[in-house]
Amino acid sequence: MAANSGLDSKVEYYRLQENEIISAVSSEDADQNDAGFRLSTIHLHLFHGLKFAALLFTVVPVFIILDSMKIIFQRKRRFCLDHVNRSFLRQSSWILDERICQYVLNPLFVCLYPSTFSSPTYVKCNIPIEDQKSPENNIFQDHQLNAPKIVSTKFYQYVMPEGFDPTTDPVLVFYHGGGYALKLTPTSFSFLNNMRNAFPKMAILVPDYTVTATDDQSKKYPLQILQNVAIFDYVVKTMGCKNVVIMGDSAGGNAVLNIVLYLRKCHREIYPKKVIAISPWANATFFHEGEKEYMQGTQEWDGLCLKSHSMFGRMFVGNNPNVDFTSDPFVNIEKNFETKMWQDILKKCSVMITYGSDELLSFQNKILAKKMSDASEGCNHFTAKNVLVEHQGYHTGPILNYSRNMDRWTNIPSIARILEFMQS
């Protein structure tokens, strides 16, 4: 949120450190504390920045070379530059830890936001009493989660076409990935720009939910779910948008599926028109029997590794030993799939799931797609056309395709299917 002008550095410091001011402190002491806090933060940025740079420019190149040689000599596939890109993404994710996300990558990504992100829209939402009292909404029924009753968040207008009519024109709300731990990465900008060119009359909004790369338990699950629902509510209620498409990749795929699940659990009437989950994070903390072994085999072709997947899962839920996250339907959507809930959801909005056959998450996504298909049996709301399995595709492949040639981009099979679904 934007800083209040009436708050001085003393108040800001204690708000960060203690969440409340217990006693009055002299201005001189506050200035010293504030300076010490800034120095400590700078030290952390420098230390973890140097650590990340050292690993990125020493360890990562070595493993990229080893991965490339392995492909060439084993001859399982024809070697191409795409394999180098996957290896770079995979090895880069392998060297990540919570501090690198918090003190290096997230500040860097924010600095790289395009000029169109200069004026965010802030949203403050009081969670409806009906949501809090719904017996099906475990976020509030499980009091150990300490779910907030008021949430604040923001979103950016990536593009707002001139003369946009919220009652008829489409709006795409794009929930970015990154394991809920990372800010919007620059790799998404090319995809969003191509979407803008493909649909000139479509507005594109990008939510900026709170990331989990922090020790603060209050910034872990379920905050992100509530923030994402708050953005959707703002779009349909305050902005009055009727033709809403919500899309997300990886953790963003988890987000868009959780939004409609939350709406159903709270017996809401307004749903998005379409939901597109690209390589959705269907289970954040749960692994099926044999799934880890499967992931260890598929990760050699993917851009994501098992180590980072597990790390993001731990960061998402945080340290709350009083909660069984394994059985939480928002944390592990596929594992706790509620057929009746999704039958109702699929009658109210169209859902599309895409993933690649080379993906680390393909095991859980295949099961999720099958469960959705079974839930829609006899209704034809979720058919084979709603599932795209890209042959030898990797994690969030459609988002990571950097082509600026619109003719070439729109003819990529995965992109073409997504565009067709949006236009249907």
UniProtKB/Swiss-Prot annotation:
Enzyme class: hydrolase
N-acetylalanine: modified positions: 2
Pfam families reported for this sequence: Say1_Mug180
MF GO annotations: steryl deacetylase activity
A single Gene Ontology CC term: endoplasmic reticulum membrane
Alphabetized SUPFAM superfamilies for the sequence: alpha/beta-Hydrolases (SSF53474)
Record membrane topology: Single-pass type II membrane protein
Keyword Endoplasmic reticulum: yes
Transmembrane segments: 46-66
Function comment: Required for the deacetylation of acetylated sterols. Involved in the resistance to eugenol and pregnenolone toxicity.
Similarity annotation: Belongs to the 'GDXG' lipolytic enzyme family.
Protein name (record): Steryl acetyl hydrolase 1
Gene source species: Saccharomyces cerevisiae (strain ATCC 204508 / S288c)
GN (gene name): SAY1
